[in-house]
Structures are given as C-alpha cells and as structure tokens.
C-alpha cells in the first residue's frame, strides 16, 4: 500500500496523461497500467471552460486519485498560482511542485522548489516536490514537512533510465516519507531498478505514451514495478568479487 498524506493507493505506478496519440490509446493504456493515480499539467486542463477540449474527457476521474502538477512554472509565484487554480477548481489538494530552472536540461530549480513547498505547506496542501537526485535537498524538504519527495531518474523525456543509482539509494535510505522516482524512465527495466533501490513508487509518462505500443508498455511497467518491489522486499544476495559454488560439496569423496 502506497500512502501519501491521506491518500492510499494499491498500485505503485503513477501515470502521466500527456503525449498520447489519441484518447482511445490513452484510455486503454491507463487501464493496462493498473494505476490508481493520474497526473497532469494544470495548464493543459480546461478547468473552467467546459466548451474547450478536455484531454481526459473519456476517463472516469472518480476512479482515480488526480494528481495535478505545476509543469510550466519557472518561478515560485507561477507554481503557487497554478496550485491555487487546481485547488479552487476542486481537482485535488495534492500537488506535484515542478519548477524548471534550465530550459535546455529541464532540470528543476532547487531553491524555488523549496520556497514554493514552504508556502504551499503553510496553505494546507499535500506537497510532493520534483527534484534532481540531490541527497541533501531531499532531506531538507522532508524536514520542511513535504509528504513525498520525487527525485528524477534522469532528465525529463530522455528515457536514459537511472543516471545516479547511488544518490537515489542514499535518498531512499535516509527518507521517512515516500520516495517516488520521476522522469527519465525509458523501459520496464528502469522502473524495476528504481523499485529494487527501494523507491516507494515510480511516476512515468513518455515511456508509455511514446512507446511503439503504449498499451503493452503500460502493462510492462506495471509488471516491472511489481517485480522490482518484490525483489526489494525479498532482499537480494550480497555482491561478491569471487565465485562461490552453488552446488553442495558433500559427497565428492564418492567420485
């Protein structure tokens, strides 16, 4: 069971809803993923004008926890304003704080993110910041009172997988809030690796929506995350630098 603030989810896969070729594929991929949480950029949603296109028109949002994000924000004020729009529209009081600090790499701005989280927490939001794989920042945000921390695997949309498994493992080890690996996942292998490192969940979008077969990839991600979590809970064998026979040595005297 994944718990973020007051929200409880069976699935540890959080799915982004953008970049699908059409609504039919999007709907089938959501179903195949088994997710309980759908995340979306507030600026993409027409929250006040029902006459404008709605990218989630065919999805019964009552079946999911909706998880808006502040994608597109470059300043603290922009992130706060986007969060307020989502809350006032009755979408959800849980917000992914995403403030981009560099247009080329799309890496998050750590200072602005911290400041925005501080304000949103004071206003009663369930706050989940998106950050680089910064061990110290992750801990400082937890101490601030955020409800989950969302370190990237690699830059948004690159599909490079986990660039810094060591830092992610440090973040997980030191955490007392859920750690959700977010951005850069390219395959089910990457998702499984994140879970094997001890992450509580994985958030992904492009890896599914831009796959050759998004529906199959959604199912693959579901299974990869489940396998990775089971592997983490089972406990892998220690890494050794010398070979160790797996067959018993007893009985060799009879040969």
Curated annotation (Swiss-Prot):
- Superkingdom, taxonomy of origin: Bacteria
**GO cellular component annotations of the record:** cytoplasm
Q: What's the chief localization of this chain?
A: cytoplasm
Keywords linked to the UniProt accession: Cytoplasm, Schiff base, Thiamine biosynthesis, Transferase
Q: Which residues form the active site?
A: 96
What pathway is it annotated to?
A: Cofactor biosynthesis; thiamine diphosphate biosynthesis
Q: What is this protein called?
A: Thiazole synthase
The organism named in the record is: Staphylococcus carnosus (strain TM300)
